[in-house]
Amino acid sequence: MLITFVVDTSGSMSQKTTNGMTLLDCSKAAIEHFIKIRSKDASMRNDRFFLITSEENPITAVKIGWKDNFNSFIQEVKNLQTKDMSNLGFSLQKSFDFLNQFRVQSSIDNYGQGRNPWFIEPAIIILLTDGSSLTNSSSIIENFTLPKTQFHLNSDPTSEPFRWDQRLFSIVLKFGGISSNKSLPLPMEPAIAPMCDVTGGRCQVATNMKTMIQQVEGLMQKLQGGVVVSFEPLVNQQQAQAQAQQLLPPPPLSLHKMLYVRQQVGFWPIPEGYYPDITSLSLPMRLAHPVIRYSIIEADTHIPENFPFDKYELEPCPLTQYLLTNKIQCTHVFMMNSLQVSGQGEPFGCLRLNSAGNSVNLFVFPYNFPRLWILLEDLTTTFKMMPSQKWKQEFEGYLLSIPPYYINPLRGALKRFCSLNLIPDNIDSQFINFINNTIKKIKSQSISKMESERIINSKQQQQQQQQFSHQQQFQQFQQKQAQQYDSSPSSPSSSPSSSSSNTSGIGSSSGSGNLATKKKSFHQILDQGYSSDILSELIQQDNETSENSELSQELSESSTTGSSGGGSSSNINILQRNVFDIGRVQLLNQLDKMKDHIFKKKIQKDESKHHLPISQMGNYHETIGKRETLRDIDDDKKPNTPLFGNPYRKEKSNQRYMSIDEADEGGNLTSDGEGKNKLTPNKRRRLSGRGYPSLPTLNSLSNTSTTTSTTTTTTTTTPATSTNTTITSSSSSSSSSSSSSSSSSSSSSSSSSSSSSSSSSSSSTITSSPPTTSTNPLLQPTTASITTSTVPIPSTTVSSPITNTSIITTNIHIQPTQISSPPPLSSSLAINQPTQTSSVISSSSSPPPPPPPPPLPIVNNNNVIPSSLVQVTNNNNNIPTVPVNNISPPTSTISSPNNQHLLPTPPNINNTSISTTNVPNISTTTSNESIISQPISPTHKNIAGVVRPFRPNSPPLTIDTLTSSSSSSTIPTTTNGSLSTHDTPNTSPTLSSINYNNNNNNNNNNNNNNNNNNNNNNNNNNRKNSIITTTTPNNETNNIIKFVHKEIRRPTKDNHDIIIQQLSKLFSILSDGNLRLKLLKDTINLAKEYKKSSLISKLIGYIDQIK
């Protein structure tokens, strides 16, 4: 909605009221209150606000136009001043022209095609004035007139300056200047009231501020979309007869009444008051408000089914009261001169009471709808949607009798009613061409008139600016002359007579009081407007001039007085700086003067605060910005931030656990050359986020713990007799390819000599070459002393094409012994082994064997170990696989303390021979070949001494650490490029046979060897000692444990059955009862941390079943 405020800014609006405000200030308060209430409505986002004053200049009169925003509107309202004439007719004419500026271009008025009530641009104009005499620059205007702009006489086919969707509301301010308890009679009706009634608005008189606010609030109910129409009774002979028969009173007139329009598109227009003539060059003039004639004869209320119609509610008026009182249900409405023949025309709608009987609605149908209802009824009932030629002729005659602008909406309505194409397409083509040409002509004329207006206004604005600049120059010249005139007689006299100085001192106050009238001319006040803003400026300037004059007088008089008390009568008006110098006789007089002198400034400043206009009273942000900001309450509580370091650093909180690497703790103490220990700086500790429960370790589950390392030993071939062998091995950090080749040659010679001297039982001790010394204490080698025993086994002979290879298998029982210092490393074959300590492992007697674990699953149908698990290298870059049949390798377990891992073997070892003990008549040797063991991980199987590669991200919690003490072990050791395996009678069920196939491609094996060598190097740097067990399938058990812990950490309760099912599967694999209880207790502890009460109860019941 378009809301336009027209404010009277004449001189009479500056008169004061009883509340101390001027009438202009009251008008500003009314606008602000209107916007405050309107802002509570959601429809305000579609509103546009305009501001027009009563200035005679058409350019400067429009303060807020189409291009300005809402903030500019508020600011311009505050800046209004009373300095114009009260030519309200010109202001209203400008406001209507301003609203109608773009209506022709948007075709809202729809000239010559009927009036569409749903296609409107509703607008209201609110006039705020004092209702005094209307004046202009030349004389006083006796009658209020609203002329039409001369530029729109030919371009606008509307006879009035307003439209049927624009209304004028006026609030006349008749405030009293003197407060009185007597009720004064209301003044006579203002001259603006008839104009408000013509537009469908209303004129109201406000006698005080309270009634003005109430009237502003009442305007909010008028902000409804709709159009204004006039209703007149139809006068003819039939109407007179019906009125006489029914004894009805004469029907009333209802002029300029509101039809409330809903926000939806309609179908049927209200007909024009003329029939458009195609032969004419222009359209006839139309009235702003259509005049609708109504009949008092009762009519039929039948409407065909599925036929569209429009419905509008009529505001309460004398017509509605007449119909409701006489209970007239339905009457037809007509538009005069709407046909080619002048007269009342045919009905286009009806006035009908609603179902509740408390309001009247206007129903709009097609023109001459009674005839159309008959034709449609014949089409549906008689012809069954198959019209005859006679019906088509009658229907075509109906189309030619109605105004041509009804053809197009009727075509759309019949498509909804039936699927027949009853209206030809070319019946209204001539009318459409005529209307289009006429509308184009009207638009072009309006554009040219607007352009001419713009040029004329710009020229007038330039002339006014020139005149204003000349006036300012002339006023400045007059002010300079006035200042020179005032300064010449008011100069202080230089005569020494005290009387002249006293008289000037006495008259200083009166002179300062008249200073405003001397310096400010009344002509200038009239030109600028005598508003509250100018009053505040005058008071402020007068106060400054009076203060300056008094201070200058005080200083001049006090300088003439001496230190002696001024008791003479000539010094009565002199202010003393020292109160003790005042005589007793002058004390009372001086006391009054001192009071005025001290308190006068403060009183003037306080009074000047209350002389501000309303436009300056709302500047809260400027006032608050000038004040000193308050101290923050939380300044004392804020911590002192450091001025150094990283300003974006954030302290970590909720650190529950701190994990420290054991290698870091071991490296804190280092030995220097003199044998003294000194502390090294602590390394950065890694902080873990969430503390998970500690996992079971080997120390808490097994009674024995040993350190294990990858060792290199020479291979020996023993006969079928018991033999005790002590092997001492050591490992170094790294070796080159040349040293590895020399060591491989030596190993081949030693293997041949040992095989020739092994016919009788003997004991031998084999020691590796002295290694080189390592500088890093964390890379110290490990020396292990292993005592083994063998038992005779029936010998079998296996033929193999591969020679110079022997395999030694021994079952070893390992017991912890004392830790000895490592020997120096000087071997050419060295391995990076970051272990903390070295241990010597020996055993003289074997303890009773533990209960056998469940049998291992079969690897494949042929019981063949994949060739990728055993890698053989030679100098010819050929890696053949070694088939071994009918060998029952024992299960082996190598135990180590917690957080230790088995190191990989050197990547390049040649001339390796594999020896086997207790497997008689098996002697296979190979030349220039080596079997390289992969890095051993606790998460992979180790079957028959074959080690599978590990996963880099395998967790430390495995079943290998839990079953290390319940089975025998096999230690694969290598010395000088040979691999040996020993067994004892305490073995568990293993695979029945191992087949080595020698059918793989050499190139593929070479690639596998290179990849495994790379893995060895990476694992050598990332892994420490590993724990290996082959009593159970490690992958399956470890996956079960990880899955159970993951399910416990999930914040759900529907996975308890899955956890119990997986634990049952795990316990069916594990045969040790203590191991089961330990795993179950650790699972309960983890469930307690995550507060799984129902799961804990199930697990406790499971413990009772195991026990």
From Swiss-Prot:
Q: Where is the MIF4G domain?
A: 1041-1103
Region annotated Disordered, chain positions: 454-515, 542-572, 629-801, 818-861, 946-1034
* Family note: Belongs to the Integrator subunit 6 family.
Question: What cellular component terms from Gene Ontology apply here?
Answer: chromosome; INTAC complex; integrator complex
Which CDD domains would you find in this protein's record? vWFA
Q: Which Pfam families match?
A: Beta-barrel_INTS6 (PF25462), VWA_2 (PF13519)
PANTHER family under this entry? DEAD/H BOX POLYPEPTIDE 26/DICE1-RELATED, INTEGRATOR COMPLEX SUBUNIT 6
Q: Name the InterPro entries for this protein.
A: Integrator_subunit6, VWF_A, vWFA_dom_sf
Q: List the subcellular locations.
A: Nucleus; Chromosome
Q: Does the keyword Nucleus apply?
A: yes
* Chain intervals with Low complexity compositional bias: 460-513, 546-562, 693-801, 956-975, 997-1034
Name the predominant localization.
nucleus
Write down what this protein is called.
Integrator complex subunit 6 homolog
Polar residues biased stretches: 976-996
- Which Gene Ontology BP annotations are present? RNA polymerase II transcription initiation surveillance; snRNA 3'-end processing
Q: Where is the composition biased (Pro residues)?
A: 846-857
Free-text function comment from the UniProt entry = Component of the integrator complex, a multiprotein complex that terminates RNA polymerase II (Pol II) transcription in the promoter-proximal region of genes.
Q: Where is the VWFA domain?
A: 2-195
Q: Where is the composition biased (Basic and acidic residues)?
A: 629-639
Q: Does the keyword Nucleus apply?
A: yes
Gene3D superfamilies, per the entry: von Willebrand factor, type A domain
**What SUPFAM superfamilies does UniProt report for this protein, alphabetically?**
vWA-like
Oligomer status and interactors:
Component of the Integrator complex. The core complex associates with protein phosphatase 2A subunits, to form the Integrator-PP2A (INTAC) complex.
| Keywords, ordered alphabetically | Chromosome, Nucleus
